[in-house]
Amino acid sequence: TLKVRSWETDSNIPTPATAYVREVQDIQHAIDAVGGFPVIIKVTQGTQGHGVFLRHTLYEAQNLIQGLLMTGKSILVQQYVAESHGKDIRAFVVGYELVASMRRRARGREFRSNFHLNGTVEPVEIDDGFRRVALEAAKVMGLNIAGVDLLESHHGPLVLEVNSSPGLEGIERSTKVNVAAHIARFVMDAHAENNHLLSNQYTQERVLIANEDEKVSANSFE
């Protein structure tokens, strides 16, 4: 999984405020930088909702982060978006086209909405603003196939994560879209296009070689 990095300096993609913690001394500064408590604390290489925590006090945050740092984990602290608590949108991008989207909701007191954490899923039609942000996020990450997770904030879409190997079960079950077929079609089209380019390149090289051979042959009779 590729987690969202801090893009504020090199793109216009909206994300929750995020700060990295590399040592214990960074904790208070990171919390202040994202707007204070509550905060989301993440292990940067977690998947399917694992390694994501919600903390409400400095004591809780320090205990958690210190323990994670001791295990060599890379940690980030992220703004908590209250209006999106327990829900998000997964936009599935294939070949820079949005092929399906679903809303995920957490169950009970769980704040993580991941399907693999027993969250519920439902199809959702996202507007042009969400669509543009999802496509741009995949493009910036250089991914032809991506699951872009979006929060619905009062200020519009916020990119939470961009996943390079998104699961298909939840999105296909909720939307009834055959996402696997879209992926297969994209891969086959890309393969055909690559073969076409290679064929053209080979033909051009053969023409150049033939022309050079003719020049050599002509010069030999002068």
What do the predicted segments below correspond to?
Residues V39, A100, A146, L158-E161:
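Protein kinase-like catalytic core scaffold
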Residues D26-A30, E60:
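Short acidic active-site motifs
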Residues T71, F111-V159, A181-H182, F186-H196, ...:
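A long amphipathic alpha-helix within ATP-dependent nucleotide-binding catalytic cores
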Residues E8-T9, I31-H50, K73-S84:
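ATP-grasp fold ATP-binding core
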Residues L168-N178:
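Short, flexible active-site recognition loops that position polar ligands and cofactors
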Residues R90-V93, G156-G170:
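A short beta-strand motif that forms the metal-chelation/ATP-contact edge
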Residues T1-A17, H29:
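Conserved N-proximal alpha/beta basic substrate-recognition cap immediately N-terminal to
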Residues H50-M141:
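Phosphate-binding site of ATP-dependent enzymes
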